[in-house]
C-alpha cells in the first residue's frame, strides 16, 4: 500500500573530539503521496548553491546567521531548520508534478543573532518563535521552479528595552523567495548541466534585505555569484562617533558581492564513491564611506575547504 515509516540520524564529530548530531528525524507517510517529519533537519532548499560549496559569511544554519556590521546574505534559511535551540515539524504532499510543503520551526529566536545583538541592541528573549514556511514546487523533466515564504507568527518573542525601560519588539521577520533550476545530469552524466537562479527578500524589524544568486555546474566544476543588498533603517548608535553633517538617516546600507567555486575529484585512490570536493569563495562588503556601522575589518572575506565524501 506504499505506507512507510523510519528515522534518520547523522552523527557529526568535530576536531575537539566531541560528538554531535547534524540531523535527527522521525518520519512516516505514503510513498510519492504524503509525509510527516519531525526532529532536527532542513526543509526545502530555496537558495541552492549547487555542488558541495563553501560559503561562510555570518552563519550557515538556522543559528548565528546574523551579525551586526558584517552584512547579511539572506537565503530563506531562517525557518528552514537544523536549529540548535529548537525543532521542526514538516508536512509534505505530492500531486503529480506539484510538491507542497509546510515546515514549522519552533526555537529560541535570539539564536539567529550572533552575540544576541541586533541593530546595536542586546536582545531579551521572552518566548520561543514559531516560523511557518510553506513551499510550492513544480518539476517537469529537467526543469523545476519553487516559491516560498517564511514568517515568525509569534509577536513580542524577543526585543530590547529602550531608555525609558519599555520593551521594543524586534521579532517581526517575513521572508519571500523563488528559485528555478535546470538539471539534466541524470540523463547525461558526462556533459549534463545543473543551473540555479534564486532570489530572496526579507522584511524585518527596522531592516529590508534582498539577495539574488546564480550558479552553474558542468563536468564537476561549479561557479556561482551572489549579490546581496541590506537596508538597515534603525540602529542604536550609542558609543559610535557622531558626525553632525550626517544625521545617520540611513545608518546601514550594504552591498555584498560573493563569488564561489567548487570542483569534484572523483574516485580517490581508485575507490568508487570516494570523492574529494574543493571549494573556495571570496566576498566583498561595500558600504558608503560615512557608514558608522559597517565593520571595516571584515569588509572582505574569503575561504577554502577540502571535503572528503564516501557514498555508501
Describe the function of each predicted region.
Residues 1-6, 29-36, 97, 138-142, ...:
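Short loop/turn motifs that connect adjacent beta-strands in outer-membrane beta-barrel proteins
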Residues 1-107, 128, 137-141:
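Outer membrane beta-barrel
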Residues 16, 47-50, 61-62, 100, ...:
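Outer-membrane beta-barrel proteins
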Residues 265, 299-312:
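Outer-membrane beta-barrel "beta-signal"
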Residues 18-24, 83-87, 94-96, 128-132, ...:
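Residues that define the transmembrane beta-barrel architecture of outer-membrane proteins
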Residues 101-159:
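Loop-centered beta-sheet repeat module
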Residues 6-10, 39-41, 101-105, 146-150, ...:
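Transmembrane beta-strands of outer-membrane beta-barrel proteins
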Residues 133-264:
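Detector for outer-membrane/organellar transmembrane beta-barrel domains
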Amino acid at each position: 500500500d506504499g505506507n512507510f515509516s523510519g528515522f534518520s540520524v547523522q552523527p557529526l564529530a568535530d576536531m575537539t573530539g566531541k560528538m554531535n548530531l547534524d540531523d535527527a528525524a522521525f518520519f512516516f507517510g505514503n510513498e510519492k503521496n504524503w509525509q510527516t517529519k519531525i526532529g532536527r533537519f532542513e526543509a526545502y532548499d530555496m537558495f541552492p548553491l549547487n555542488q558541495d560549496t563553501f560559503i561562510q559569511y555570518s552563519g550557515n544554519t538556522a543559528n548565528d546567521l546574523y551579525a551586526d556590521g558584517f552584512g547579511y546574505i539572506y537565503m530563506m534559511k531562517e525557518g528552514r531548520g537544523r536549529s540548535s535551540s529548537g525543532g521542526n515539524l514538516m508536512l509534505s504532499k505530492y500531486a503529480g508534478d506539484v510538491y507542497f510543503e509546510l515546515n514549522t520551526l519552533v526555537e529560541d529566536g535570539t539564536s539567529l543573532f550572533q552575540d544576541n545583538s541586533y541593530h546595536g541592541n542586546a536582545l531579551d528573549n521572552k518566548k520561543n518563535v514559531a516560523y511557518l514556511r510553506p513551499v510550492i514546487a513544480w518539476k517537469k523533466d529537467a526543469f523545476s521552479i519553487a516559491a516560498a515564504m517564511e514568517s515568525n507568527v509569534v509577536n513580542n518573542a524577543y526585543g530590547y528595552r529602550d531608555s525609558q525601560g519599555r520593551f521594543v519588539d524586534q521579532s517581526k521577520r517575513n521572508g519571500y523567495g523563488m528559485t528555478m533550476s535546470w538539471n539534466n545530469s541524470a540523463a547525461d552524466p558526462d556533459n549534463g548541466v545543473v543551473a540555479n537562479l534564486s532570489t530572496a527578500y526579507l522584511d524585518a524589524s527596522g531592516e529590508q534585505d534582498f539577495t539574488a544568486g546564480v550558479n552553474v555546474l558542468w563536468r564537476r566544476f561549479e561557479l556561482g555569484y551572489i549579490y546581496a543588498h541590506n537596508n538597515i533603517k534603525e540602529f542604536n548608535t550609542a558609543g559610535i562617533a557622531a558626525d553632525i553633517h550626517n544625521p545617520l538617516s540611513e545608518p546601514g546600507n550594504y552591498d555584498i558581492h560573493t563569488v564561489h567555486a567548487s570542483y569534484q575529484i572523483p574516485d580517490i585512490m581508485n575507490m568508487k564513491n570516494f570523492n574529494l570536493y574543493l571549494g573556495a569563495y571570496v566576498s566583498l562588503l561595500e558600504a558608503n564611506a560615512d557608514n558608522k556601522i559597517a565593520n571595516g575589518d571584515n569588509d572582505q572575506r574569503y575561504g577554502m575547504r577540502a571535503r572528503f565524501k564516501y557514498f555508501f
